[in-house]
């Protein structure tokens, strides 16, 4: 018998994964435009936007859009690093935007890796690392964004499908015993 995973199970697992990552300081769920970045004080932020659920013969795929972002700081007194003097064409402003892109991309790849490899799930209470409860497949397109919001903020966004088993059993559906046919 399959222990079907619900939307809450999947979402709470993603949030728990974010909580255990030492660089992620805040999490949120919902429409990305509902985030009030002016009130947010702790970054890096991982935001989960649920997009859809698709069914297979014996599985559900919960689809999410995941944002990993941090604040960009600009200071008038900053000077360019002499080690990067050859890369001045790449660095147009005196800010930490390049570092933010670098760090948030690493967090994104960490997050994908935790879902691709069941070892992480084993550390979180699953006895057999060969029996993942949640997993993902396919390749991912990770897209950068910057200044998408009111604050100077940048990071990466990607779409991910979380596959879980579901046996679509009909024995415990809360309906009356009578048939539905006329």
Model regions and ranges:
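A solvent-exposed, charged loop/short amphipathic helix patch at secondary-structure junctions
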Residues: 74-100
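Charge-dense, low-complexity intrinsically disordered segments
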Residues: 1-8, 94-98, 102
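Amphipathic alpha-helical interaction segments
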Residues: 52-55, 73-76, 118, 122
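A hydrophobic membrane-anchoring alpha-helix module
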Residues: 156-182
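Oligomerization/assembly interface segments of phage tail-like spikes and tubes
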Residues: 58-74, 87, 151-166
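Short conserved micro-motifs at the rims of enzyme active sites and ligand-binding pockets
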Residues: 58, 76-79, 171-173
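Small/polar-rich, solvent-exposed N-terminal microdomains that initiate assembly or binding
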Residues: 1-59, 123-127
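Acidic-leaning, charged glycine-interspersed low-complexity segments
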Residues: 37-42, 97-163
């Amino acid at each position: 018998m399959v222990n079907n995973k619900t939307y809450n199970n999947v979402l709470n697992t993603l949030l728990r994964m974010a909580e255990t990552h030492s660089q992620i300081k805040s999490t949120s769920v919902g429409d990305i435009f509902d985030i009030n970045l002016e009130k947010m004080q702790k970054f890096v932020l991982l935001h989960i936007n649920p997009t859809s659920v698709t069914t297979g013969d014996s599985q559900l795929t919960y689809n999410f859009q995941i944002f990993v972002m941090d604040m960009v700081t600009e200071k008038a007194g900053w000077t360019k690093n002499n080690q990067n003097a050859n890369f001045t064409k790449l660095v147009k402003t005196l800010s930490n935007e390049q570092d933010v892109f670098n760090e948030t991309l690493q967090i994104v790849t960490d997050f994908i890796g935790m879902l691709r490899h069941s070892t992480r799930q084993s550390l979180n209470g699953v006895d057999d690392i060969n029996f993942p409860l949640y997993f993902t497949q396919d390749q991912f397109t990770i897209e950068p964004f910057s200044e998408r919001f009111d604050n100077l903020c940048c990071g990466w966004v990607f779409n991910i499908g979380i596959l879980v088993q579901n046996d679509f059993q009909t024995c415990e559906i809360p309906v009356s015993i009578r048939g539905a046919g006329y």
